[in-house]
Design a protein with these regions (language model features):
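Aromatic- and acidic-residue-enriched segments that line the glycan-binding/catalytic groove
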Residues: 31-43, 108-113, 146, 202-208, ...
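Catalytic pocket-lining loop regions of alpha/beta-barrel enzymes
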Residues: 125-133, 149-311, 315
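Active-site flanking residues adjacent to catalytic metal/cofactor-binding acidic residues
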Residues: 19-21, 193, 247, 320
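Short glycine-enriched loops at secondary-structure junctions
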Residues: 99, 140-142, 195-201, 322-324
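Mid-to-C-terminal alpha-helical segments outside catalytic/metal-binding sites
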Residues: 2-19, 27-92, 119, 123-127, ...
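Divalent metal-dependent hydrolysis catalytic cores, especially in the metallo-beta-lactamase
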Residues: 18, 63-70, 82-107, 131-139, ...
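Active-site loop-helix segments enriched in His/Asp/Glu that coordinate
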Residues: 100-126, 144-152, 170, 174, ...
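Acidic-and-aromatic substrate-binding clefts and catalytic sites of carbohydrate-active enzymes
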Residues: 71-75, 102-103, 139-146, 168-175, ...
């Protein structure tokens, strides 16, 4: 049942029992992963002095959107629970570890890191509170091993999606990655694409940027490229049950992409005969976008017009990006999002997207 209120000021998160689709625990360090590595990789980590793997597109040292009052708010499961889940009255929270694992060149090291991180998440986070859910880290550098990792966690429904980043080694629609999507679709995992870059390639069509702020704003191009690739290469027609969640992508750019891709498809569809319907229809059926950070107008009426161009209220999923700071009070429903859709965005859409997620009413 969707939540509707007369005044947005009355709508506090605690009244919704929301599911937060983008919460960040701290990234694991060597001492965290050692218990979950075999002897070979423990020796390798020590000899190569591998400790903490930052994703260079979002280095922890800069922390441009870190809340000063929440520096250690995600240090462990208990602290995250107290600072976020309890404070906001959340029904569940999806934990996303975005780290340098996504950028490791060695496919075997990446496989070991993903497996160890998943075990660490399961034992040190998911086991500590039944409201925690998580994204499964799999090595896109080694698709066969990634599919095996998905199979390994098929019966652990605390893991609800498979995670990668928006700007990786190649477009995600390539057949190289299809074993990952086949395993994910088979077991009800969504595919989650988070803002971030492995810097395998320059993040812009003109080369590398000079400043972090430039890298931040071109992330949207990375998301747009992946949407186009997944549609055009036929992933969504091959795996019709697969949902794709765009994390920290923004929202307002997608309607224009849907219109343009459908327009150009009408003239060039001879190249992709497996696409039998307009790309805009496929995108509305398969893609979902998280609400934080929202790139629309701060006025609710104007924001509703922008969201209306999606032509599908089911495409938005509630998120906070905690503990990152986007300049608003997390305890109150976001001003830019229509209050009439609060229940739809914060619960209904989440449950219909994540087939593996079960929560009490």
């Amino acid at each position: 049942m969707s939540t509707a209120v007369e005044s947005q000021e009355e709508l506090r998160l605690t009244s919704l029992g929301a599911v937060d689709c983008d919460v960040h625990p701290r990234s694991p360090r060597r001492q965290d992963l050692m218990p979950y590595l075999d002897e070979y990789w423990r020796d390798m980590f020590t000899s190569r002095d591998i400790d903490h793997l930052d994703l260079m597109s979002n280095p922890e040292a800069t922390a441009p959107n870190r809340r000063d009052d929440q520096v250690d708010a995600n240090a462990d499961a208990e602290t995250l629970r107290d600072n976020h889940l309890d404070k906001l009255g959340l029904t569940a929270a999806v934990l996303n570890v975005v780290s340098g694992i996504h950028a490791v060149y060695d496919p075997y090291l990446a496989t070991a890191l993903c497996a160890a991180t998943n075990r660490w998440l399961a034992e040190e986070w998911l086991a500590k509170d039944t409201r925690f859910r998580a994204s499964l880290l799999v090595p896109f550098q080694h698709p066969e091993a990634a599919a095996e990792e998905i199979e390994r966690y098929a019966d652990d429904t605390r893991f609800v999606q498979v995670l990668t980043v928006a700007m990786g080694e190649m477009p995600l629609g390539r057949r190289l990655y299809w074993p990952i999507y086949e395993a994910a679709a088979k077991h009800g995992f969504a595919l989650a694409i988070h803002a971030g870059s492995t810097f395998r390639h320059a993040p812009t069509q003109s080369g590398f940027s000079s400043f972090l702020v430039e890298d931040r704003i071109v992330q949207t191009q990375g998301f747009a490229n992946q949407v186009g690739s997944l549609v055009a290469e036929g992933v969504l027609t091959k795996y019709p049950d697969l949902k794709v969640v765009l994390l920290e992508s923004g929202v307002t750019w997608l309607p224009g992409l849907m219109w343009r891709m459908s327009k150009d498809w009408r003239g060039a569809r001879v190249e992709i005969p497996w696409i039998k319907e307009a790309p805009s229809k496929l995108i509305r059926e398969h893609f979902r976008m998280t609400t934080q950070p929202f790139d629309g107008p701060d006025d609710e009426a104007e924001a509703e017009k922008a969201i209306g161009h999606l032509e599908n209220d089911e495409m938005l999923l509630f998120s906070t990006d905690f503990p990152h700071d986007h300049g608003r009070d997390l305890t109150v429903w976001p001003r830019a999002l229509p209050s009439r859709l609060a229940g739809t965005i914060s619960r209904d859409n989440v449950l219909s997207t994540y087939r593996r997620l079960e929560i009490s009413s």
